[in-house]
A protein has these predicted regions:
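Mature, function-bearing regions of proteins
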Residues: 1-203
Length: 203
């Protein structure tokens, strides 16, 4: 990855339980290393208006109050977590200033380029956001088959109660992104996936 990648993905949402529903649609994400100075395409900007843009205010903390990369670095340092060598942000960009980013991911890699920690920022229609710190219990590199649990502490879907757990899977390859989030509770739950090829972002 030399600059910024574009992921033209498909996302799927399937609700389990008494109220069943599922749908899928195409969605565009970008994957960027905010700690590197890279040459950005003409139609894409960081922290300035453009056709497509990424603002630190949208990521790394509460909506419209984000601190971007610094927020992630402080979390990793405060908890002495691995993965501080390279941190990538996977997120939906703004389009003509409009932002809709229900979930974004901070992917944290070690010196050997192994994925060690992921911070998932999940928002809902009420303007709330919560962050889920994902890593293996022994802090070993995260593999595609690993299922990593985290507790859900507020409503994301109006049809889902606040009790239950999130289970994450991350398959981050040089040519493909494949992420799944499963909400588990007695009598129901929710499955969401994000899958798409990685390609350099160009004009």
């Amino acid at each position: 990855m030399k600059g910024i990648d574009h992921i033209h993905a498909q996302t799927y949402h399937g609700r389990k339980g008494p109220v069943k529903n599922d749908f899928s649609y195409a969605i565009d994400y970008v994957l960027i290393d905010l700690n590197r100075s890279v040459s950005l395409p003409t139609l894409f900007s960081h922290n300035s208006f453009n056709l497509f843009s990424l603002y630190d205010l949208d990521h790394g903390g509460m909506p419209k109050q984000g601190q971007g990369l610094r927020w992630v670095q402080e979390i990793l340092q405060a908890q002495d977590l691995p993965g501080q060598e390279r941190i990538l942000l996977l997120a939906q960009p703004r389009t003509l200033g409009h932002v809709f980013n229900p979930v974004s991911f901070w992917l944290c890699f070690d010196q050997q380029d192994h994925l060690r920690v992921v911070i998932a920022e999940v928002g809902n229609t009420f303007g709330q956001r919560h962050s889920y710190l994902c890593h293996r219990d022994n802090f070993a590199p995260i593999a595609a088959q690993d299922k990593i649990s985290a507790q859900k502490i507020f409503h994301v879907s109006p049809f889902q109660p606040t009790h239950g757990d999130y289970q994450f899977q991350f398959d981050i390859q040089s040519e493909l992104i494949d992420i799944s989030i499963e909400y588990l509770r007695e009598g129901g739950g929710l499955l969401a996936t994000l899958v798409g090829p990685r390609q350099p972002l160009t004009n």
